[in-house]
């Protein structure tokens, strides 16, 4: 029998310890992985609610199971808030992840073997934008565009490539691009070749919601995003569109029943909370600070002699090219991690290293900004990171790591994730 008093600590102490250790890790480490963030206690409360128990196949008002009247309220709340947040006529809040949202868009608009044109993973795209190891590169004929040696999208080259390969869909969006994307230009190119423009805005959705990064909504046929990352919600996906009922029906059918069964109603409840939080005025302040912090960090890295891909950032992330310092991304990632600074290794343009080694690191500011870091704090942090990188392969490396870790623990104590 079930009792409210049941808990993990008594029943499964090994699992409980892992949870406690992760809580401590998050509090005592500075999180600079661009795709990570901290969900609010309200989001986590919703995700742990009793909607965990409810099957709700179908959509609000059209369910295959009974007892869905409250699930309908929750899902409709999430839909309405998502539409208001991004200026969309249509929203599907059921995708379990960003990748599943993307898969649904492909299924709705393409046939197997159709040509897609997306940004290369090695140049800052995403697995689902046509990488050979992804469904997007296996089911569809994937062509890839890249960035210049300066780290920028060459729209003239993209136009030429689109006219040559004649894609059914052009995919916009990225996982490691630090500049503004010209969505209008991409739509112009798509229209020239009769292609759909599909934008995956997962990395910058929070910035877009706050108005600090241009929205693709006026230009794209369909837009997807994750609900974590800069949106700081639960892990999940979202599809948005401004079009017509025929398009919306195709998208709905591609999510359910084609791609998924029952939605995760407890996660949809958490998405509803996330969207409400993102509609608050303080969310705009937070997102503006995310960009300010990224720019402040870039300034320090450049002053210390490190190359930043595209020479700067206009969003929440940037790539540090370590080639001229003779370092690999893998080694830099490991060294910073020992000082409780978490980044991820990342390929840079024309990277001479293998994908699991790389010549760069990706740095993002959503999580550190969420816990209260300002420009002064992140500038100091960037200096500590440069100290560690400068000391690699030198006699004082271990001491620099030890000294930096002390500073990291002190600032984490001053600015806790969950005070």
Curated annotation (Swiss-Prot):
The record marks 228 as: Plays an important role in substrate specificity. InterPro entries: PyrdxlP-dep_Trfase, PyrdxlP-dep_Trfase_major, PyrdxlP-dep_Trfase_small, Ser_HO-MeTrfase, Ser_HO-MeTrfase-like, Ser_HO-MeTrfase_PLP_BS, SHMT-like_dom. Pathway: One-carbon metabolism; tetrahydrofolate interconversion; Amino-acid biosynthesis; glycine biosynthesis; glycine from L-serine: step 1/1. It catalyses: (6R)-5,10-methylene-5,6,7,8-tetrahydrofolate + glycine + H2O = (6S)-5,6,7,8-tetrahydrofolate + L-serine. SUPFAM superfamilies: PLP-dependent transferases (SSF53383). It comes from the Bacteria. One of its GO terms (biological process) is glycine biosynthetic process from serine. Belongs to the SHMT family. This is Serine hydroxymethyltransferase. It comes from Histophilus somni (strain 2336). The lineage of its organism: Bacteria, Pseudomonadati, Pseudomonadota, Gammaproteobacteria, Pasteurellales.
């Amino acid at each position: 029998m079930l009792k409210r008093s049941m808990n993990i600590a008594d029943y499964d102490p090994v699992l409980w310890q892992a949870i406690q250790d992760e809580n401590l890790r998050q509090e005592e480490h500075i999180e600079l992985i661009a795709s990570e963030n901290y969900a609010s206690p309200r989001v986590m409360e919703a995700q742990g609610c009793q909607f965990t128990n409810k099957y709700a196949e179908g959509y609000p008002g059209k369910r295959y199971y009974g007892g869905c009247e409250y699930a309908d309220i929750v899902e409709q709340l999430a839909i309405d808030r998502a539409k208001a947040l991004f200026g969309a006529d249509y929203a599907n809040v059921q995708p379990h992840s960003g990748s599943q949202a993307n898969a649904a868009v492909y299924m709705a608009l393409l046939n197997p073997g159709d040509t897609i044109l997306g940004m290369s993973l090695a140049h800052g795209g995403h697995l689902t934008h046509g990488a050979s190891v992804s469904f997007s590169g296996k089911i569809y004929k994937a062509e890839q565009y890249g960035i210049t040696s300066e780290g920028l999208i060459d729209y003239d080259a993209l136009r030429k490539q689109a006219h040559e390969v004649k894609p059914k869909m052009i995919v916009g969006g990225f996982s490691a691009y630090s500049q503004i994307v010209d969505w209008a230009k991409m739509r112009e190119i798509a229209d020239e070749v009769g292609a759909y423009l599909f934008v995956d805005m997962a990395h910058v959705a929070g910035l877009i919601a706050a108005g600090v990064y241009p929205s693709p909504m006026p230009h794209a046929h369909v837009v997807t995003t994750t609900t974590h990352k800069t949106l700081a919600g639960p892990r999940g996906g979202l599809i948005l569109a401004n079009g017509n009922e025929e398009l919306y029906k195709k998208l709905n059918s591609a999510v359910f029943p084609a791609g998924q069964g029952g939605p995760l109603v407890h996660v949809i409840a958490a998405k509803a909370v996330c969207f409400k939080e993102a509609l608050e005025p303080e969310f705009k302040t937070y997102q503006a600070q995310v960009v300010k912090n990224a720019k402040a960090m870039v300034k320090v890295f450049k002053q210390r002699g490190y190359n930043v891909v595209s020479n700067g950032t206009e969003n929440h992330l940037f790539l540090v090219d370590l080639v001229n310092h003779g370092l690999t991304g893998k080694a830099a990632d490991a060294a910073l991690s020992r000082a409780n600074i978490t980044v991820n290794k990342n390929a840079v343009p024309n990277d001479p290293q293998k994908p699991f080694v790389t010549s760069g690191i990706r740095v993002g500011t959503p999580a550190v900004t969420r816990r209260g870091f300002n420009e002064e704090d992140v500038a100091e942090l960037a200096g500590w990171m440069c100290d560690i990188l400068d000391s690699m392969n030198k006699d004082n490396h271990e001491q620099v790591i030890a000294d930096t870790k002390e500073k990291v623990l002190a600032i984490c104590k001053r600015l806790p994730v969950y005070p």
